[in-house]
A protein has these predicted regions:
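Non-globular targeting/processing and membrane-anchoring segments
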Residues: 1-103, 117, 127, 131-274
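Short glycine-rich or small-residue beta-strand-to-loop segments that form or flank ligand, phosphate
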Residues: 103-109
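Conserved redox-active cysteine motifs that mediate thiol-disulfide chemistry
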Residues: 109-120
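An acidic-aromatic
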Residues: 122-126
Length: 274
């Protein structure tokens, strides 16, 4: 009886892996198609300051499950680090600033699986510098649980946050970019890939967090795993990316606050940022 159970478990695992691979193939095809929509051309003009205030108030596609305590429930920061000091980020220019504060930019779309995965790290990192409100949890069209920031606000003494989801779950136009934002997008990411994350003079197109790692899991399960620093690969990946984002923010804002920027892992990462 035990042997039969083992065999069944193996069969189920193989079936699960095949399904994940099928989803990954579909995601790659859909993302490749979507990216063509965001090719906005090159641009050599100087980067202009983005429109926005201390809080980013965005509106758009409705989502589910109001989660006012979500940001504070992703667990304490850990010592996880990316494979390289600056992760997948590359130097793009001077530090973006808004109202005298370092500016953090996220351009994505609600259908985008890598955007969904990256939001976990963004929320965990930025919660160390300020406070989110009016967030929701939702599930991406490919089954990836994530945060919906389209109604969110963010307040911080140290950081300005700009988040724009350009299309909804069905690929319909959602949040249009301003002229300055389109210029920044074309300069930092000429290929038009999403998500685009920019902070501290560095930018990244894509995400090192594999969406398949959390696809099909309930939002609360991912949240709980992060809160308890479980041994799952996605927990390590999200925590490492959160630390990378934190280091870039600390580099840009003069290493404040000490609670976020004074940790040894962050000081080590900041030392590698030019």
């Amino acid at each position: 009886m035990a042997k039969a159970t083992v065999k069944t478990d193996k069969q189920e695992e193989k079936q699960r892996q095949r399904e994940l691979q099928r989803r990954a193939d579909l995601i790659r095809q859909r993302t490749a198609s979507r990216r063509r929509r965001f090719r906005l051309g090159g641009g050599a003009a100087a980067v202009l300051l983005l429109v926005g205030a201390v809080a980013v108030a965005v509106r758009g596609y409705g989502s589910t499950t109001p989660t006012s305590a979500v940001a504070a429930s992703l667990g304490a920061p850990t010592g996880a680090t990316p494979p390289t000091p600056t992760g997948q980020f590359h130097k793009v220019g001077s530090v973006l600033r808004q109202g005298g504060k370092a500016e953090f930019v996220f351009f994505g779309a609600l259908y985008c699986p890598h955007c969904a995965a990256e939001r976990w790290a963004i929320v965990k990192s930025l919660s160390q510098f300020g406070r989110f409100a009016h967030m929701s949890s939702t599930t991406n069209g490919q089954g990836v649980p994530t945060f919906d920031l389209t109604h969110a606000t963010y307040q911080s003494k140290y950081l300005s946050f700009v988040a724009r989801d350009m299309e909804d779950q069905n690929g319909n136009a959602l949040q249009a970019l301003s002229a300055d934002q389109r210029l920044l997008f074309s300069q930092y990411d000429p290929s038009g890939g999403i998500p685009l994350v920019a902070v501290g003079g560095y930018a990244m197109s894509g995400s090192p967090i594999l969406p398949d790692e959390i696809s099909g899991r309930p939002f609360n399960a991912v949240q709980s795993a992060l809160k308890h620093n479980a041994g799952d690969t996605f927990v390590q990946d999200i925590n490492a990316e959160a630390n990378e984002l934190t280091a870039l923010i600390c580099h840009a804002d003069g290493m404040q606050p000490q609670a976020a920027c004074g940790r040894p892992v962050i000081r080590h990462l900041v030392a590698s940022v030019r």
